[in-house]
C-alpha cells in the first residue's frame, strides 16, 4: 500500500511536470507565431510604401487620358469645368484614406499582439478590416504596378489570417 501511494505521488508529479513543459512549449510557440505575424504586418506596410511613387504617375496618366480623349473630340471645352471634373474623378480614385486606415489597423494589430490578453479572434477581426482597406485600394488603383503590390499585400494578409486561427 505504501508503495502504491508513492507511485500515485510520482505519477502526479510526472503529470505536473508534463503540464509545465506543455505550457512552456505553448509559450515559446506563441512567441514565434507572434513574431511571424508582426513580420508579415511589416511586409504589408512596406508594400503600402511602395505604392506611393506610382500614385502621382497614375494621377498624371488619368489627366493625360482625359485631355487626349477631349482632343480627339475636337470640341471647345471650358477649362475650369474640365479641371473640376478631373479633380472630382481623381478624388474618387484617391487611396490616401485607405492607406491611412491600413496604417492604423497595422498599428492596432501590433498593439493587440503585444498585449497580455492577445486574443486570436480580435486579431482576426483586425485582419478582416485590413483586408477591406487593401481591397478598396486595389479596386480604386487602376494601375498595374499598384495592383501587383495589392496582390502581395493580400498574400501576406491571407497568411496572417491562417496563423491567427492558431491563437487562442
Mark where each language-model region is.
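Glycine/charge-rich, flexible interdomain linkers and switch-proximal surface loops
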Residues: 1, 32-35, 61-65, 81-85, ...
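Short, small-residue-biased leader/transition segments that mark boundaries at the very start
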Residues: 2-8
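Amphipathic, non-membrane alpha-helical segments in soluble helical-bundle scaffolds
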Residues: 9-12, 31-41, 52, 56, ...
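Amphipathic, well-ordered alpha-helical segments in soluble domains
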Residues: 14-18, 40-43, 47, 105, ...
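Long, charge-dense, solvent-exposed interaction surfaces that engage phosphate-rich ligands
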Residues: 18-72
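Long, amphipathic alpha-helical coiled-coil segments characteristic
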Residues: 32, 83-118
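Small-residue-rich helix-loop
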Residues: 51-99
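C-terminal non-catalytic interaction appendages of large macromolecular assemblies
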Residues: 102, 106-168
Amino acid at each position: 500500500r505504501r508503495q502504491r501511494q508513492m507511485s500515485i505521488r510520482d505519477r502526479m508529479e510526472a503529470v505536473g511536470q508534463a503540464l509545465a513543459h506543455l505550457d512552456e512549449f505553448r509559450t515559446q510557440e506563441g512567441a514565434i507565431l507572434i513574431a511571424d505575424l508582426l513580420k508579415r504586418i511589416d511586409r504589408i506596410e512596406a508594400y503600402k510604401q511602395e505604392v506611393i511613387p506610382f500614385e502621382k504617375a497614375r494621377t498624371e496618366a488619368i489627366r493625360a487620358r482625359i485631355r487626349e480623349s477631349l482632343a480627339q473630340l475636337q470640341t471647345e471645352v471650358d477649362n475650369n469645368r474640365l479641371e473640376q471634373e478631373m479633380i472630382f474623378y481623381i478624388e474618387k480614385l484617391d487611396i490616401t484614406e485607405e492607406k491611412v486606415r491600413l496604417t492604423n489597423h497595422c498599428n492596432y494589430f501590433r498593439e493587440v499582439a503585444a498585449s497580455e490578453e492577445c486574443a486570436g479572434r480580435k486579431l482576426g477581426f483586425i485582419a478582416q478590416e485590413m483586408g477591406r482597406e487593401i481591397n478598396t485600394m486595389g479596386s480604386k488603383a487602376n494601375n498595374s504596378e499598384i495592383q501587383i503590390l495589392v496582390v502581395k499585400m493580400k498574400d501576406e494578409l491571407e497568411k496572417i489570417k491562417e496563423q491567427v486561427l492558431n491563437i487562442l
